[in-house]
């Protein structure tokens, strides 16, 4: 599998004195790990471009037995500037990247994941204000894009428009919303206000650069966070634990 294309560096690590492994997100192949032999020293082949969050044009080949990938060359396309000096924003980016890695992205969902992750970095690089709950917004949208999409428009039981009812409950295990007419017959779940439902729709339909305009109250943010974390825990099997995402 030999190819040349743009990619986003997610993480790197050293496995010998002069060699690196590089994990990157490709818009056509998803999350891939390749070995950059001489990556710590070769300025001609890599030009110092293998820092996390850099966009790089990569040239990748397979070894003779086709058991692993080799990163032969990398050319820096662009990299963040503000993120390098703003630790708060760096932390938000790191949290989002960890989720991309933990969830795993294959070729089928690669384009959406790449666009979303690039949009996340653009917002963190350019926006004046970053919502505190941004990592949770990102996790929800990535899950939606990778096949776990939910319908925040109609009740899953009767088809009634959720905008037209007074109370709505979200059921994480089923991944559906039901209106108050059913009285929580399924048991469990979380009550969702109209503003939180609007936020779910907005995040599903718009890129990250527009998420700074979501008019949610503190209670609305709490509802979103509880619902998304419970949904991802049940369907994706990931929880945030001691600074990392852990499979359960």
UniProtKB/Swiss-Prot annotation:
<dbReference type="GO" id="GO:0006302">
    <property type="term" value="P:double-strand break repair"/>
</dbReference>
<comment type="similarity">
    <text>Belongs to the RecO family.</text>
</comment>
<comment type="function">
    <text>Involved in DNA repair and RecF pathway recombination.</text>
</comment>
<dbReference type="InterPro" id="IPR042242">
    <property type="entry name" value="RecO_C"/>
</dbReference>
<dbReference type="GO" id="GO:0043590">
    <property type="term" value="C:bacterial nucleoid"/>
</dbReference>
<dbReference type="Pfam" id="PF11967">
    <property type="entry name" value="RecO_N"/>
</dbReference>
<dbReference type="InterPro" id="IPR012340">
    <property type="entry name" value="NA-bd_OB-fold"/>
</dbReference>
<keyword id="KW-0233">DNA recombination</keyword>
<protein>
    <recommendedName>
        <fullName>DNA repair protein RecO</fullName>
    </recommendedName>
</protein>
<dbReference type="InterPro" id="IPR022572">
    <property type="entry name" value="DNA_rep/recomb_RecO_N"/>
</dbReference>
<keyword id="KW-0227">DNA damage</keyword>
<dbReference type="GO" id="GO:0006310">
    <property type="term" value="P:DNA recombination"/>
</dbReference>
<dbReference type="InterPro" id="IPR037278">
    <property type="entry name" value="ARFGAP/RecO"/>
</dbReference>
<dbReference type="Pfam" id="PF02565">
    <property type="entry name" value="RecO_C"/>
</dbReference>
<dbReference type="InterPro" id="IPR003717">
    <property type="entry name" value="RecO"/>
</dbReference>
<keyword id="KW-0234">DNA repair</keyword>
């Amino acid at each position: 599998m030999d190819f040349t294309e743009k990619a986003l560096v997610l993480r790197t690590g050293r496995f010998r004195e002069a060699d690196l492994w590089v994990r990157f997100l490709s818009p056509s192949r998803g999350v891939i790990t390749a070995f950059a032999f001489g990556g710590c020293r070769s300025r001609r082949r890599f030009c110092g471009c293998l820092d996390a969050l850099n966009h790089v044009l990569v040239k990748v080949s397979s070894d003779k037995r086709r058991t692993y990938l080799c990163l032969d060359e990398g050319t820096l396309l662009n990299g963040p500037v503000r993120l390098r000096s703003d630790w708060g924003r760096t932390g938000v980016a790191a949290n989002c990247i960890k989720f991309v890695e933990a969830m795993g992205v294959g070729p089928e969902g690669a384009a959406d994941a790449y666009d979303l992750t690039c949009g996340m970095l653009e917002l963190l690089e350019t926006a004046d204000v970053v919502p505190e709950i941004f990592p949770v917004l990102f996790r929800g949208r990535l899950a939606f894009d990778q096949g776990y999409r939910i319908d925040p428009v109609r009740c899953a039981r009767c088809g009634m428009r959720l905008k037209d009812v007074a109370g709505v409950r979200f059921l994480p295990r089923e991944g559906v919303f039901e209106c108050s007419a059913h009285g929580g017959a399924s048991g469990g779940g979380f009550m969702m206000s109209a503003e939180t439902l609007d936020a779910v729709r907005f995040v599903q339909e718009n890129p990250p650069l527009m998420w700074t305009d979501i008019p949610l109250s503190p209670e609305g943010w709490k509802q979103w966070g509880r619902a998304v974390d419970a949904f991802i825990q049940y369907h994706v099997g990931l929880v945030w634990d001691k600074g990392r995402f852990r499979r359960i």
